[in-house]
Curated annotation (Swiss-Prot):
This protein's name: Alanine--tRNA ligase
Substrates-to-products reaction catalysed: tRNA(Ala) + L-alanine + ATP = L-alanyl-tRNA(Ala) + AMP + diphosphate
Organism of origin: Synechocystis sp. (strain ATCC 27184 / PCC 6803 / Kazusa)
SMART domains referenced in this protein's UniProt entry, alphabetically: tRNA_SAD (SM00863)
GO cellular component: cytosol
Entry keywords, A to Z: Aminoacyl-tRNA synthetase, ATP-binding, Cytoplasm, Ligase, Metal-binding, Nucleotide-binding, Protein biosynthesis, RNA-binding, tRNA-binding, Zinc
PROSITE patterns from the UniProt entry: AA_TRNA_LIGASE_II_ALA
The protein's required cofactors: Zn(2+)
Biological role stated in the UniProt entry: Catalyzes the attachment of alanine to tRNA(Ala) in a two-step reaction: alanine is first activated by ATP to form Ala-AMP and then transferred to the acceptor end of tRNA(Ala). Also edits incorrectly charged Ser-tRNA(Ala) and Gly-tRNA(Ala) via its editing domain.
Protein residues bound to Zn(2+): H562, H566, C664, H668
Cited NCBIfam families: alaS (TIGR00344)
Family recorded in the similarity comment: Belongs to the class-II aminoacyl-tRNA synthetase family.
Length: 877
C-alpha cells in the first residue's frame, strides 16, 4: 500500500531527524560556527567538518554517536543559485555519526526506517546507489532492506567513494534518491536526471586507510558519516517544485517580492531567479555576520562582501533602487532565531553591517555602471582586460560583477588581460601574507598517533618533573639533540602554557643532569604541547627526566594581561554596545590586543570611560573564581563563549563576580588588584566592521608612560615650547604649512597655464576643428586638467590632449573636447583617453567632454601622443 508523506515544516523535519537519532543513543550537538577550526577551508562546508579531526584520528571522540543539524556555506556553484531547483550557498545538513561504534548495516537500516517510517516516503519512490565495488552494501539493501536489485545502482568512485585526501581514512558511500516521476517506469533509471530524481541522504562508510602507494587496508575502528539536506527533504515533503519555495526560504523571497512590488506567481523566470538569489544569499549573509564574519576584501570576509553585493545587484534588477537588505534580513532572522538564537542577539550588528555594505556598494554601482555602459556600447563583443581592471581598481567593481553584467548583454570579458594587469598587486598581496610552515604540524600529527596528549599542570604548578617523549630538530623527529641546536621538545606533562585562546606560550627552562634547555615558546596542537627552545648545555634524548620551570615574571604579566582582556570585553559591552562580540585577541607578556565586531569607531569619551571602569574594577580587588562545569550550565549562567571556538562537554569558566563571566582555558590573576593598572594605547579599524583596541597593564603601563614622557620632552625641546604649549604650537605650524602648500599649488597652476599659452600657436586646424596634442613636462595632474580646459576654451571648437610625467615612471593624460566636436563627431573624451592610456600601461575615463587617465610606463608616452594625434586627424579629417 502506498503511503502519503506528511506535509512537515522545515523545523519539524529538523526536530524529527534529531529526535529519531537521540532515541537511538546519539548525542544531539549544536551546529558548529560557520568559521571552522580547520585552516584548510574558509567556511564550514559540510556536516562532518567539525568531526574531521576525529575521523582523521587526530582527536578522540567524546561520544560514540552524535547527531547534528549543521549550517553550511558553499559558493563553488554560486552561478547556479536560483537557476536550478536545489543549488544554494547556505544550507543545513542533518547528520548522524558513529565514531567506531555501529557501521554499515545499522546505518542503512536506520536511514531506511527514518525515510519510510518517520517521513513516510513511499518505498516504491526510493532508489539507492552504492559504490560499484561495495558488494556488502548492495547485499544489505537487497537482502536486509528488500529493495529490488534493479533499483540499486552501482556507481563509480567519482560519485560514491569518499576520500579525506591523497592518503588517510576513506570509504564507499551509498545515497538515497527520491523519484518524482515513478510513472516513467524502472527500465532506464538515470540518477543524474535532476528533473526526475533528487538525492536527499548520503551515507559514508569510512572503512579503509589509503597509503602513499594507493593501497587500501581496513581500519580498526570504522566510522559513519551521513548527511541529509534539510532543504531537499522539505521540498519533497512540502510538495513544491524546488527548494526555494519551501517554508525555509520562501518567506524571504516573498519579503523581497513585496518590496519590489512583484507577484511571484506571475513573475517571469528571470525575475524569479533574482528573487531566489536574494532569498538564498540573505540566509548566508545573516548567519555569517552572526558568526562574527565582517565584510572585507580577504578570505571569508570577501565571500560575505560578494554575497551582499549580489543581493544588492539582483535587487536593482528587480527595480529596487533604495536600500532594502535589512528588511529582507529581518525575515531571515525571524526564521532562524528559534534554532540559532545568536542570529536574533546580533540582529542590530547584522543590520549595521548590511547598511554599511549596501550604501557603499550602491555608490560603487552608480559610478561603475556608467563606465561599463560606455564600454559595452557600439557593438562591443568583449570588454578589454585593462578596462575590467580599471573598473576594479578605480571603482571597486569585482571582476565577477563585471562578468555578470556583461554576460546579461551577451558580452565576454578578457579575463587573461585582467589577470595580467592585476599581477603586480597580487604579488604585493602574496608578499603581505604570512607563510605558514606546516612541517612541525605534520610531525605533531604523526606523534599524536603514538604519544598520549601532554598533561597540563600549569594551572596549579609553575615547576614539575617530566619525561621527554619526543625530540624534534627542524620539525623532524630525532633520537637526540646537543648543545647549540634549536629544538622542539614534547614532554609527558608540563607546567608550560601552550599558546591558545590568544594567550602566548610560556617561557622558561628545562633542566637535567648537565642539561639546560632555554624555552622561548610553547604551542599546543593535537593535544600535544611542543616546547620551542635551544639546548644551552648537555644532550637531550627521548626518556630523559628533566625539571620544567616556567619564567614566573613572564607568567605574571601574561595572566594579568589575560584577565585585563576579559575586563576590557565586559567594559566594551557596558559602555559601547551589549551586542559586541570578540573577533580575536592577543595576550602577550608586555601588551594585549582585543579585536571585536563594531560598525563604528569607539569615541575618545567612550575609551576614557572604558579605561576608568577597568581601573575601578582593579582597585576594587575582585577575586577571580575558576570552575569547570558542563557547557550547558556555563551558558545558563550567561558565560560568554567566543564564536569559532569549539568547546567540549566540560568547560573552564573564569568568573570575576559581578564584572565578567567567560569560557576560557587561559591563565589568570587570582585577584584583579594584581593587574595594578590598565591603559588603552590605541583604537583602530582592521577590517570593515572590525575594530581593535591595544592596551598595556601592570608594569607595562609605567614603561609606556616613560616612553611618552620622553617623546613629549623631545617635542618640547624641538618646538621650544612647554608640554602644555605643544598642541597650540603644532596647530600654528600646520596652518603655516597649509598656507605654503596653497601658494605652491597656485604657482604650479600659473606655471602650467603659462606653458600652455605658448602652445596655442601649435594647434593644427582640421576642417572646422583645431587639434592640439602636447607634453607639458612634469606638471601635476590637477594643473594639467586646468590647462587642458583653458586651452580648449581659447581654441573654441577643438580637441586638446595634454600629457605630463609628474613623477618618475608615472604618466598623466587629459583630453578636453568641445561640445560640438562630441556631438557631430561622436567622439567621447573618456573612451578616447582610456584607449590612449592603455599604450602607457594604464587606463582611465570620465565625461564625454573632459576626462583624465594615467599610465605606468613613461617610456611609451611619445608613442601614446603620436597615436592620439593620428587618431584625431583621422576622425576629424
Amino acid at each position: 500500500m502506498t503511503t502519503t508523506p506528511p506535509v512537515l515544516s522545515g523545523p519539524e523535519i529538523r526536530q524529527q531527524f534529531l529526535n529519531f537519532f537521540a532515541d537511538r543513543q546519539h548525542q544531539i550537538l549544536p551546529s558548529a560556527s560557520l568559521v571552522p577550526e580547520d585552516p584548510t577551508v574558509l567556511l564550514t562546508i559540510a556536516g562532518m567538518l567539525p568531526f574531521k579531526p576525529i575521523f582523521l584520528g587526530q582527536k578522540s571522540a567524546e561520544f560514540p554517536r552524535a547527531t547534528t543539524s549543521q549550517k553550511c556555506i558553499r559558493t563553488n556553484d554560486i552561478e547556479n543559485v536560483g537557476r536550478t531547483a536545489r543549488h544554494h550557498t547556505f544550507f543545513e545538513m542533518l547528520g548522524n555519526f558513529s565514531f567506531g561504534d555501529y557501521f554499515k548495516s545499522q546505518a542503512i537500516a536506520w536511514a531506511w526506517e527514518l525515510s519510510t517510517q518517520v517521513f513516510k516516503l513511499p518505498a516504491e519512490r526510493l532508489v539507492v546507489s552504492v559504490f560499484e565495488e561495495d558488494d556488502e552494501a548492495f547485499a544489505i539493501w537487497r537482502d536486509e532492506i528488500g529493495i529490488p536489485a534493479h533499483r540499486i545502482q552501482r556507481m563509480g568512485a567519482d560519485d560514491n567513494f569518499w576520500v579525506s585526501g591523497p592518503t588517510g581514512p576513506c570509504g564507499p558511500c551509498s545515497e538515497i534518491y527520491y523519484d518524482f516521476h515513478p510513472e516513467l517506469g524502472d527500465e532506464k533509471l538515470d540518477l543524474e536526471d535532476d528533473s526526475r530524481f533528487i538525492e536527499f541522504y548520503n551515507l559514508v562508510f569510512m572503512q579503509y586507510n589509503r597509503d602513499n602507494a594507493g593501497n587500501l587496508t581496513p581500519l580498526e575502528k570504522k566510522n559513519i558519516d551521513t548527511g541529509m539536506g534539510l532543504e531537499r527533504m522539505a521540498q519533497i515533503l512540502q510538495k513544491v517544485p524546488n527548494n526555494y519555495e519551501t517554508d525555509l526560504i520562501f518567506p524571504i523571497i516573498q519579503t523581497a517580492a513585496n518590496i519590489a512590488g512583484i507577484d511571484y506567481a506571475q513573475a517571469n523566470e528571470k525575475t524569479k531567479v533574482s528573487l531566489k538569489v536574494i532569498g538564498d544569499h540573505v540566509r548566508s549573509v545573516v548567519h555569517m555576520i552572526a558568526d562574527g564574519i565582517s565584510a572585507s576584501n580577504l578570505g571569508r570576509g570577501y565571500v560575505l562582501r560578494r554575497l551582499i553585493r549580489r543581493v544588492v545587484r539582483h535587487g536593482r534588477l528587480l527595480g529596487i533602487n533604495g536600500e532594502f537588505t535589512t528588511k529582507v534580513a529581518a525575515t531571515a532572522v525571524q526564521l532562524a532565531q528559534p534554532v540559532y538564537p545568536n542570529v536574533l542577539e546580533r540582529q542590530s550588528l547584522i543590520e549595521q553591517e548590511l547598511q554599511r555594505e549596501e550604501a557603499a556598494f550602491l555608490k560603487t554601482l552608480e559610478r561603475g555602471e556608467k563606465l561599463l555602459a560606455d564600454l559595452m556600447a557600439d557593438g562591443v563583443t568583449e570588454i578589454a582586460g585593462a578596462d575590467a581592471f580599471t573598473l576594479y581598481d578605480t571603482f571597486g567593481f569585482p571582476l565577477e560583477l563585471t562578468q555578470e553584467i556583461a554576460e546579461e548583454q551577451g558580452i565576454t570579458v578578457d579575463v587573461e588581460g585582467f589577470e595580467k594587469a592585476m599581477q603586480e598587486q597580487q604579488e604585493r598581496s602574496k608578499a603581505a601574507h604570512e607563510t605558514i610552515d606546516l612541517t612541525v604540524q605534520e610531525s605533531l600529527d604523526k606523534l599524536a598517533n603514538h604519544i598520549h596528549p601532554t598533561e597540563f599542570l600549569g594551572y596549579t604548578d609553575l615547576q614539575s618533573s617530566a619525561i621527554v617523549k619526543a625530540v624534534l630538530v627542524g620539525g623532524e623527529l630525532v633520537d637526540q639533540a646537543v648543545a647549540g641546536q634549536t629544538v622542539q621538545i614534547v614532554l609527558d606533562q608540563t607546567p608550560f602554557y601552550g599558546e591558545s585562546g590568544g594567550q602566548i606560550g610560556d617561557k622558561g627552562f628545562l633542566n637535567g643532569d648537565n642539561l639546560l634547555i632555554r624555552i622561548e615558546d610553547v604551542k599546543r596542537e593535537s593535544g600535544i604541547f611542543i616546547h620551542f627552545g635551544r639546548v644551552e648545555r648537555g644532550t637531550v634524548q627521548i626518556g630523559t627526566t628533566i625539571t620544567a620551570t616556567i619564567d614566573r615574571a613572564c607568567r605574571r604579566r601574561a595572566q594579568a594581561n589575560h584577565t585585563a582582556t576579559h575586563l576590557l570585553q565586559s567594559a566594551l559591552k557596558r559602555v559601547v554596545d551589549e551586542g559586541i562580540s570578540q573577533a580575536g585577541s592577543l595576550v602577550d607578556f608586555n601588551r594585549l590586543r582585543f579585536d571585536f565586531n563594531s560598525p563604528r569607531a569607539v569615541t575618545m569619551e567612550e575609551l576614557q570611560q572604558i579605561e576608568d571602569l577597568i581601573n575601578q574594577w582593579i582597585a576594587e580587588a575582585h577575586q577571580t573564581e575558576v570552575a569547570v562545569m558542563p557547557i550547558a550550565d556555563a551558558k545558563a549562567k550567561g558565560a560568554i563563549a567566543m564564536f569559532g571556538e569549539k568547546y567540549g562537554a566540560e568547560v573552564r569558566v573564569i568568573d570575576v563576580p559581578g564584572v565578567s563571566l567567560e569560557l576560557c582555558g587561559g591563565t589568570h590573576v587570582a585577584n584583579t588588584a594584581e593587574i595594578g593598572l590598565f591603559k588603552i594605547v590605541a583604537e583602530t579599524g582592521i577590517a570593515a566592521g572590525v575594530r581593535r583596541i591595544e592596551a598595556v597593564a601592570g608594569p607595562s603601563v609605567l614603561d609606556y608612560l616613560n616612553v611618552r614622557e620622553a617623546v613629549v620632552k623631545e617635542l618640547g625641546d624641538r618646538l621650544k615650547a612647554k608640554p602644555e604649549e605643544i598642541p597650540d604650537r603644532v596647530h600654528q605650524l600646520q596652518q603655516e604649512l597649509k598656507a605654503s602648500q596653497k601658494q605652491l599649488e597656485a604657482l604650479k597652476q600659473e606655471l602650467a597655464l603659462q606653458k600652455s599659452e605658448q602652445l596655442l600657436t601649435q594647434a593644427q586646424t582640421v576642417g572646422e576643428f583645431k587639434i592640439l596634442v602636447a607634453d607639458l613636462g612634469t606638471v601635476d595632474g590637477e594643473s594639467l586638467k586646468t590647462a587642458a580646459e583653458r586651452l580648449q576654451q581659447k581654441l573654441g571648437e577643438s580637441a586638446v590632449v595634454l600629457a605630463s610625467i609628474p613623477e618618475e615612471g608615472k604618466v598623466s593624460l587629459v583630453a578636453a573636447f568641445s561640445p560640438q566636436l562630441v556631438k557631430t563627431k561622436q567622439l567621447k573624451a573618456g573612451q578616447f583617453i582610456g584607449a590612449i592610456a592603455k599604450i602607457c600601461g594604464g587606463g582611465g575615463g570620465g565625461r564625454p567632454n573632459l576626462a583624465q587617465a594615467g599610465g605606468r610606463d613613461a617610456s611609451k608616452l611619445p608613442e601614446a601622443l603620436a597615436t592620439a594625434k593620428q587618431t584625431l586627424l583621422a576622425e576629424l579629417g
